[in-house]
Amino acid sequence: MDKFRVQGPTQLTGEVIISGAKNAALPILFAALLAEEPVEIQNVPKLRDIDTTMKLLSQLGARVERNGSVHVDAGPVNVFCAPYDLVKTMRASIWALGPLVARFGQGQVSLPGGCAIGARPVDLHINGLEQLGAKITLEEGYVKASVNGRLKGAHIVMDKVSVGATVTIMCAATLAEGKTIIENAAREPEIVDTANFLNTMGAKISGAGSDKIIIEGVKRLGGGVYRVLPDRIETGTFLVAAAVTGGKIVCRNTRPDTLDAVLAKLTDAGADIEVGEDWISLDMQGRRPKAVNIRTAPHPGFPTDMQAQFSLLNMVAEGTGVITETIFENRFMHIPELIRMGGHAEIESNTVICQGVARLSGAQVMATDLRASASLVIAGFVAQGTTIVDRIYHIDRGYESIEEKFRALGGQIDRIKGE
């Protein structure tokens, strides 16, 4: 398995171009299954999960190619099963189910894999599809969905806020007969992006970005061209990297309006921040950050996908910071690794209390999930000496060309190829 070797300490300074959002590109690629005509999707990041999704769409019979943009023609889809060998590495595969049953009246998806962070049950997806009239069975590790004729619009009140299930229900409802209302819907920018993509193809969706989404079913979706929104988590990760190393950075091709909670906490930490329509600059002027208190919450609250990066910030900050994780259990697996580098922290159930230290020391550490692995790489830039980050396949699932981007900011980082 590949590893990263990181030399520190380094003050990260310069400009970085932000890639398209993985968490919007994935649902959009699956939503393309609903279209009977070709679609062109621009600004799709080059990532392992994206490659897996493109392979999966091809196996279902779609014509998929990448030349700058990703082109998907789901017209010829004639296979309705997403097999285990592709699904096992990626939870997002469950998003194939809604479009398949909505357009073809049948679909089956192997129960998914992905990051090992807590319970992410597919129950909410299944309940939503059942309320739209699908018959669901679980057989031999597969979720199977079928319906006679079209799905029927329904008034669905979600038991808890779920980005994944909101996407599934919204996509399936676009081709249902009649009106669907989703209450307690997730409000993330990536939900809005997926809805905008569907509307480009002829769907009638309103209210995305609020907790109540209304979908007027249509008989078919056509083609279109759509540009995926920038990745707010990648943006936040690079901003934190500059903040913890006392550096100065400009993130370009980004969307400041998707990052209010993160920018507020970086300001609390002592960063000077400026924003334009599609850029954010952060300047620490060589200062150490101040510790901050954070409670993760569904959007527009503080994103759970930025929790690991801010845990690191608190470990090297002045003072003591408390972070409470309310979204996923088991999401502090990076903390013991940071403690091995000299950090001070205590975990009490879903809370981590970090006492800032003046410096970390390079060490061998292991990535456990996507965002945790990014925080370990950044820790390597703060630490004195050499840090080796193992299992970086997690990073490749969610960050495009991360080592090249860090090198352009002055970071010393190399990829060590595994056996």
From Swiss-Prot:
This enzyme's EC code(s): 2.5.1.7
Pathway the protein acts in: Cell wall biogenesis; peptidoglycan biosynthesis
Task performed by this protein: Cell wall formation. Adds enolpyruvyl to UDP-N-acetylglucosamine.
Residues holding phosphoenolpyruvate: K22, N23
UniProt xrefs under HAMAP family: MurA
Family matches, as Gene3D superfamilies: Enolpyruvate transferase domain (3.65.10.10)
Active-site residues, as the UniProt record annotates them: C115 (proton donor)
Gene Ontology terms: biological process: cell division; cell wall organization; peptidoglycan biosynthetic process; regulation of cell shape; UDP-N-acetylgalactosamine biosynthetic process
Residues binding UDP-N-acetyl-alpha-D-glucosamine, per UniProt: R91, R120, P121, V122, D123, L124, K160, V161, S162, V163, D305, I327
Similarity comment: family membership: Belongs to the EPSP synthase family. MurA subfamily.
Gene: murA
Catalytic activity: phosphoenolpyruvate + UDP-N-acetyl-alpha-D-glucosamine = UDP-N-acetyl-3-O-(1-carboxyvinyl)-alpha-D-glucosamine + phosphate
Location of this chain's protein in the cell: Cytoplasm
Positions in coiled-coil regions: none
Pfam assignment, any one: EPSP_synthase
Primary location group: cytoplasm
This protein's GO CC annotations: cytoplasm
Residues found modified as 2-(S-cysteinyl)pyruvic acid O-phosphothioketal: C115
Source superkingdom: Bacteria
Cross-referenced InterPro entries: Enolpyruvate_Tfrase_dom, Enolpyruvate_Tfrase_sf, MurA_subfamily, RNA3'P_cycl/enolpyr_Trfase_a/b, UDP_GlcNAc_COvinyl_MurA
Gene Ontology molecular function terms on file: UDP-N-acetylglucosamine 1-carboxyvinyltransferase activity
Protein's UniProt name: UDP-N-acetylglucosamine 1-carboxyvinyltransferase
Keyword list, A-Z: Cell cycle, Cell division, Cell shape, Cell wall biogenesis/degradation, Cytoplasm, Peptidoglycan synthesis, Pyruvate, Transferase
